Amino acid sequence: MSRLAKKPIVLPQGVTVEIKDNVVKVKGPKGELSQEFLPYVKIEVEGNEVWVRPNENQIIRKSDWRKIKMFQGTYWSLIRNMVVGVTEGYKKELEIVGIGYRAQLQGNTVVMNLGYAHPVVYEIPSDVKIEVPAPNRIVVSGIDKQRVGQVAAEIRAFRPPNVYTGKGIRYVGEVVRQKEGKKA
């Protein structure tokens, strides 16, 4: 049994979990998330706890246990992330480093000047909220951890930090190791 799945996911006040077929829906104060799971594990709601247990019907060979234990831990983490997302939400902060590098919101897009000959325009997805509190800072927030991380990674990919100068878009708190330049 997965070490994570040995303990239940405790549901906070105001969070409900529905399981129909292999789809888990989590509703909370910030919104609703749903995820489809494979039938390797049984997901059960008991009071205000969610248990992820192995599905004995899926075990044909002894070697299937390893696969089922892997899915059990993964699904436990995914459901836990959904519960945290609908209660607290997720947030990633990016900082833009470089002279003349800046970002601004224009309607449903983020327009970034990143040292290219043209401004970079990124359209904001509907399930994620983006704020620009300062010209050199971008805050990506939402209820789905995977989507928030994906959008932040897409924005960072427009100009990742340069290993020689450190210029570019980086996560707040990210340490960029700089290489030494050429020796003359």
From Swiss-Prot:
> Cross-referenced InterPro entries, in alphabetical order?
Ribosomal_uL6-like, Ribosomal_uL6-like_a/b-dom_sf, Ribosomal_uL6_a/b-dom, Ribosomal_uL6_bac-type
Keywords from UniProt, A to Z, are: Ribonucleoprotein, Ribosomal protein, RNA-binding, rRNA-binding
* GO CC terms, sorted: cytosolic large ribosomal subunit
Q: Does the keyword Ribosomal protein apply?
A: yes
A UniProt-annotated Pfam family: Ribosomal_L6
Record GO biological process: cytoplasmic translation
Please tell me whether the keyword Ribosomal protein is annotated for this protein: yes
Q: Source organism's superkingdom?
A: Bacteria
Q: Name one GO molecular function term.
A: structural constituent of ribosome
The UniProt similarity line reads: Belongs to the universal ribosomal protein uL6 family.
Job of this protein? This protein binds to the 23S rRNA, and is important in its secondary structure. It is located near the subunit interface in the base of the L7/L12 stalk, and near the tRNA binding site of the peptidyltransferase center.
How is the quaternary structure described?
Answer: Part of the 50S ribosomal subunit.
HAMAP family assigned: Ribosomal_uL6_B (MF_01365_B)
Q: What is this protein called?
A: Large ribosomal subunit protein uL6
Species annotation: Thermotoga petrophila (strain ATCC BAA-488 / DSM 13995 / JCM 10881 / RKU-1)
Q: What is the lineage of its organism?
A: Bacteria, Thermotogati, Thermotogota, Thermotogae, Thermotogales
Task: Give the gene name.
Answer: rplF
